[in-house]
């Protein structure tokens, strides 16, 4: 197989795996480059594709939530990765969380066994030739050599921020005499383990977090202390203020241990309710592994063990994985990309995933779907798909590719990653004050326009006699 007969995809993370599958589903050969395990990254632990290095959650399931809406759009588009996430989901209240080992193993097995996908376990150090259709989905941990070549190609200094992952605890080591099962506001089943704290416990815990020794940054990381606001280390939250954690990952609202008594009794509620609550979310289907929700950290491992064992119920916690922090690299996309995810200066070069400046697992999958589908369309000589801004996938890709959609003050500042959120969608034509109803209206409009845009493109494809386009769900 000649390289000219195939599409090159760099990186087998969430975006790269999705892109590879969409290209192959269109009947086109793929050369998929993945440097692991030949060259390790600072955050990955395995050689599997689509390894989840931070949380195991893809966010809210409900389509009237931003991440849930993007998931629903991807289900309609028959996303390979979201289908696998649904297949390997674990209980998580109203969220889509997965058994990360089974999920990644499933993705890896399906891709490596696909007859149209050739996997190359080598580091691609330079961009392929201009004639080669290529999707760069190398992720936020892009290797130094490729990042340098991208910087030379774009002529723009790389952007980066620090990201971190939470520790994982062995379930059998959690003491349920001090913790309880339950979901916030009793949504779904009792899918979380909750560790309540009184005020004295919380303040002592915060003090020790602030005093705890952090892991030393690598030389290339010391020049910056930028954090992505959606994934701040817990010790950074502790430093920001006495109540910051209580209004963030440790918020106690909506959580009640039945052993405390009648929730409807005002006196009991006032006396017993927790001052703060640490939540643990199930990592695997069997419930043997639990991650500390929102506890991304860069503390030294010994300090993690010492401080986190102050949490009620975790006095004897067995740490299966400690938290880590690493630097994430991304492109200054508004200066470089179109909403089709093509580079403006090279139409056959596309980018997808977190390297484009979208944040979160579902956004990475969406970018992979769009870049892979558009790469296939380019190979067949057709125009790429650009989704309307009223869809979540379209809103995100327009937002990262158009400076005009950012406020004047934001345009003056450096580009920062953007997760799925309703703020990037255009306003509704009618004002709806009630939040849930407003979000439901965004959802309905987005799904209607997504389906219409796909129908229109499919009709065009049928008119032109193209039978190899990906099959969409009706």
Curated annotation (Swiss-Prot):
Family: Belongs to the MnmG family. TrmFO subfamily.
GO BP field: tRNA methylation; tRNA wobble uridine modification
EC primary class: transferase
Residues that, per the record, bind FAD: 11-16
Biological function: Catalyzes the folate-dependent formation of 5-methyl-uridine at position 54 (M-5-U54) in all tRNAs.
EC number assigned by the record: 2.1.1.74
Reaction catalysis annotation: uridine(54) in tRNA + (6R)-5,10-methylene-5,6,7,8-tetrahydrofolate + NADH + H(+) = 5-methyluridine(54) in tRNA + (6S)-5,6,7,8-tetrahydrofolate + NAD(+); uridine(54) in tRNA + (6R)-5,10-methylene-5,6,7,8-tetrahydrofolate + NADPH + H(+) = 5-methyluridine(54) in tRNA + (6S)-5,6,7,8-tetrahydrofolate + NADP(+)
Necessary cofactors: FAD
Disulfide bonds: none
Pfam family, one: GIDA
Subcellular location: Cytoplasm
GO molecular function, one term: flavin adenine dinucleotide binding
GO CC annotations, alphabetized: cytosol
Keyword field: Cytoplasm, FAD, Flavoprotein, Methyltransferase, NAD, NADP, Transferase, tRNA processing
Protein name, entry field: Methylenetetrahydrofolate--tRNA-(uracil-5-)-methyltransferase TrmFO
Entry superkingdom: Bacteria
């Amino acid at each position: 197989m000649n390289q000219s007969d195939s599409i090159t995809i760099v990186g087998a993370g969430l975006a790269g795996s999705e892109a590879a599958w969409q290209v192959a589903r269109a009947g086109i050969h793929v050369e998929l480059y993945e440097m692991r395990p030949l060259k390790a990254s600072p955050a990955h632990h395995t050689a599997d594709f689509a390894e989840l290095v931070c949380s195991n959650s893809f966010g809210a399931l409900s389509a009237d939530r931003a991440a849930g809406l993007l998931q629903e759009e991807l289900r309609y588009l028959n996303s390979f990765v979201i289908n696998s996430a649904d297949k390997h989901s674990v209980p998580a209240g109203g969220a889509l969380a997965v058994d990360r080992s089974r999920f990644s193993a499933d993705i890896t097995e399906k891709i490596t066994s696909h007859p149209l996908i050739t996997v190359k376990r080598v580091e691609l150090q330079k961009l392929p030739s201009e004639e080669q259709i290529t999707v760069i989905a190398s992720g936020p941990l892009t290797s130094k050599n490729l990042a340098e070549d991208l910087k030379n190609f774009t002529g723009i200094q790389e952007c980066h921020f620090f990201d971190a992952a939470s520790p994982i605890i062995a379930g059998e080591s959690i003491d349920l005499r001090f913790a309880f099962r339950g979901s916030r506001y009793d949504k779904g089943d009792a899918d979380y383990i909750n560790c309540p704290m009184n005020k004295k416990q919380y303040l002592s815990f915060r003090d020790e977090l602030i005093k705890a020794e952090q892991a030393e940054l690598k030389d290339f990381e010391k020049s910056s202390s930028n954090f992505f606001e959606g994934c701040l280390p817990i010790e950074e939250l502790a430093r920001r203020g006495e109540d910051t954690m209580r209004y963030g990952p440790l918020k106690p609202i909506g959580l009640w241990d039945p052993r405390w008594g009648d929730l409807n009794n005002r006196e009991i509620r006032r006396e017993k309710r927790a001052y703060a609550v640490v939540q643990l979310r199930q990592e695997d289907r069997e419930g043997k592994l639990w991650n500390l929700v929102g506890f991304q950290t860069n503390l030294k491992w010994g300090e993690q063990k010492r401080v986190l064992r102050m949490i009620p119920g975790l006095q004897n916690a067995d740490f299966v994985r400690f938290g880590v922090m690493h630097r994430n690299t991304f492109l200054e996309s508004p200066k470089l990309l179109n909403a089709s995810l093509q580079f403006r200066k090279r139409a056959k070069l596309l980018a997808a995933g977190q390297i484009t400046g979208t944040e979160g697992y579902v956004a990475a999958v969406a970018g992979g779907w769009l870049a892979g589908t558009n790469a296939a369309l380019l190979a067949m000589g057709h125009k790429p798909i650009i989704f309307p801004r009223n869809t979540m996938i379209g809103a995100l890709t327009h937002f990262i590719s158009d400076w005009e959609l950012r406020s004047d003050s934001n345009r003056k500042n450096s580009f920062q990653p953007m997760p799925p959120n309703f703020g990037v969608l255009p306003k509704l034509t009618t004002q709806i004050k009630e939040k849930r109803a407003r979000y439901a209206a965004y959802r309905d409009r987005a799904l209607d326009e997504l389906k219409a845009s796909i129908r229109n493109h499919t009709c065009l494809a049928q008119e032109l006699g193209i039978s190899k386009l990906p099959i969409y769900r009706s």
